[in-house]
Amino acid sequence: MKGLFVTIEGPEGSGKTTLIKSLLPYFEQKAQKVMATREPGGIAISEDIRTILHKQEYTMMEARTEALLYAAARRQHLVEKVMPALNENYLVLCDRFIDSSLAYQGYARGLGMDKVFEINRFATEDCMPSLTIYLDIEPEVGLARIEKDAGREVNRLDMEDISFHKRVREGYLQVVERFSDRIVLVNADQPMEKLIEEVVQIIEDKLL
C-alpha cells in the first residue's frame, strides 16, 4: 500500500460530506492524485447495502445485522475501490470507515467496541487509515443542521432519538482516545471555511 488513506468521521450533521467536496479540488490543484469516496457505498454492491441500511421502514433491523451489513459493505468497497487506488499512490478521502462502526454499533447500539472491532478486523484484514479526522459536534447542533438541509434525504439513523445520537458522540470520543495515534479531533461547530483550512493544515502537516 503506497498511497495515503484519510478518513473523515463524525456524528450526523457534522459536515463530513461538505468538507470532502472542498478537500477534493484543493488537493487536485496541488497535482495530487486524489479520490473521494464514502461508506457505506462507493461501489455498486456497497451502495445497494447502503440503501438497505438507510431505509426508514427497516426499523426492525437488529443491531448485529446492522453491524454485519456495514462490515460487508466495507469489505467490498475496500478491495474493489480503496486498495487499488492506494496501490496507485492515490490520496483517498473516505467519508466514514471502521470508527463509525465502533461508535454507532459498538457503543451506541451496545454491542461492545471490542466485538465490533474484531468483525471489522476480519473485514478489512487490518487495513487502517493513515489519518482520521473526527469532526466533533453536539448532537443537537448536528441534527438541527440536517433539518435545515432540504437537499439531504433523512435516513433510518437520523430518525433515532436524541439519546442515541448522544451515545454516538460518547462512543466517538472513546474511539478518539483509544486511537489517538491516528485520530485528530476537530471542532465542527465553526464556519466551513475555517474548518476546511484547519483540516487541510492537519493533512499536509501529518502526511504530505
Curated annotation (Swiss-Prot):
Gene Ontology cellular component terms for the protein in this record: cytosol
Keyword Transferase belongs to the record: yes
Stored CDD domains: TMPK
GO process annotations (BP): dTDP biosynthetic process; dTTP biosynthetic process; dUDP biosynthetic process
Keyword Kinase (UniProt): yes
UniProtKB keywords: ATP-binding, Kinase, Nucleotide biosynthesis, Nucleotide-binding, Transferase
EC number(s) stated in the UniProt entry for this protein: 2.7.4.9
GO molecular function: ATP binding; dTMP kinase activity
Alphabetical list of Pfam families matching this protein: Thymidylate_kin
Catalysed conversion reaction: dTMP + ATP = dTDP + ADP
Amino acids binding ATP: 10-17
Residues annotated as transmembrane: none
PANTHER family, per database record: THYMIDYLATE KINASE (PTHR10344), UMP-CMP KINASE 2, MITOCHONDRIAL (PTHR10344:SF4)
Protein family per UniProt: Belongs to the thymidylate kinase family.
Biological function: Phosphorylation of dTMP to form dTDP in both de novo and salvage pathways of dTTP synthesis.
The protein, known as: Thymidylate kinase
Source organism of the structure: Bacillus cereus (strain G9842)
